[in-house]
Amino acid sequence: MKEAQNAAVELLQQGEVVALPTETVYGLAADAFNPAAVAKIFAAKERPDFDPLIVHIATVRDLERVAIVPEDIRHTLNQLTTEFWPGPLTVILPKTPEVPDLVTSGLSTVGVRQSGHPIFRAINKALGNPIAAPSANRFGRISPTSASAVMKELGGRIPLIVDAGACSEGVESTIIRIEPREGKKPIFHLHRAGPISKEQLQKFGKVQAVKPGDKLQSPGQLESHYAPLTPFRLIEKPSDFTPELGKRYGLLSYTGEEGGEFVRMHRWENVVALSPGSGKLAEAAVRLFYVMREMDEMGLDEIIAEPVSEVGLGVAIMDRLRRASAR
């Protein structure tokens, strides 16, 4: 693994892109201070330049290289970074002039986090510069949670994939923007649900979900995202589903229990569970993109997804299912 890490650092220093493991999903990494390298991320992913990238720092001390921390949120930010960094929380802050406009899609702000994955962080530290890294897949497709999934998406397009096994979280980081309030707890504008839940954030402030505007303010806000090639549809209740004669349907189930109302409502070609039998949201999140990719390769006419409870990690899972089903 050390040899792969050294090779990754050398390629990043040369202005190349490499796929790296994080605790959330595999990321396509480039030196965030090298605009030509960042441009290779957009090219490899076929990503539009209006969709900004998250910048990763090796240590909290590196934060002010990429972001300006307003005094009225400094205390709150310190609380959040102490509690959740290294980890899957991205905070949107005013950017420094050193961050290229290509990274932020011309915005005056930048999303920053410190990855909780030791290999990613070691490479980040060895590079000596912040790393820009969106998910290592073609734009709009299912995010990769394994090196083999990256290979299927970007094989032949990038020089190196560092394989560290499956990702521990399975969904992308939570993204927030902090709004200070005098004499009150701050408001956390939730731009993307993720592993750090609303309930965890409420210890430090009030959480409000953001509705996407005409201009993207952060990654993960596009209506259609995380989509398999097979037509994909989330149904909120069994009565919403009317099968067409002759079509082969697969069910993306929460637990896959035979007595469940979604499992019983149709003679499915395949039933694949996110959390087989147990109904654990953490397991469902880890398996989500893996299962979606698996079902995408089954030759189905359509994948039908049943909902999960929107508490804790369930909010992030439902966000991904809704965006995958948007056409």
Language-model region placement:
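Active-site-adjacent structural elements in enzyme catalytic cores
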Residues: M1-R327
